[in-house]
Amino acid sequence: MPFLFVSGTGTGVGKTFSTAVLVRYLADQGHDVLPVKLVQTGELPGEGDIFTIERLTGIAGEEFARFKDPLAPNLAARREGIEPIQFDQIISWLRGFDDPDRIIVVEGAGGLLVRLGEDFTLADVASALNAPLVIVTSTGLGSLNAAELSVEAANRRGLTVLGVLGGSIPQNPDLATMLNLEEFERVTGVPFWGALPEGLSRVEGFVEKQSFPALDAFKKPPAR
């Protein structure tokens, strides 16, 4: 059962829309895809990232946990006075979707080193499942540093970063943004997959024009 983890250089960089694009792309290649949100914070019942992904792709997903306050998951649990997420619980839950022909696309919470529980991060979960990563980055001033730091943190932990994807680019990008698009691949050392247009509301028409060769490494499902 292959996993693909999607992490960001921070919060609000376009990670959910990027996850939706990757989910739809894999589904269009004939894969059985299950989108998963590990932890949602700060959203009302029936709202949040996993519902956005379903709305954009038409593919329903699963969510492990949610907390009321828009905080890092361990802090949100602490504030609510409930037991924090346990590492073994989340690994067991993910492995419960066991199906050799399914790809589980896992959206993290914030960045790679955000604490999901008191003593573990998204990087630890990805490592335990031997899962590759896609890093979603902002594209404006300061983004090169954030992207390089995220890729370096992943590499130090023995994780494979398949690519860096810009979560949002304005219709009229400024000079810093335009130059950053040319530099991401050089400074991170991994392929840069381009950037999603700001205000993207549908993924189907957009995905049809995209190519993510690194995702072709996932075994194609048998013809039926």
UniProtKB/Swiss-Prot annotation:
Its cofactor is Mg(2+). GO terms for cellular component: cytosol. Substrate binds at residue 41. InterPro entries: DTB_synth_BioD, P-loop_NTPase. Mg(2+) binds at residues 16, 107. Belongs to the dethiobiotin synthetase family. Catalyzes a mechanistically unusual reaction, the ATP-dependent insertion of CO2 between the N7 and N8 nitrogen atoms of 7,8-diaminopelargonic acid (DAPA, also called 7,8-diammoniononanoate) to form a ureido ring. This is ATP-dependent dethiobiotin synthetase BioD. It comes from Corynebacterium glutamicum (strain R).
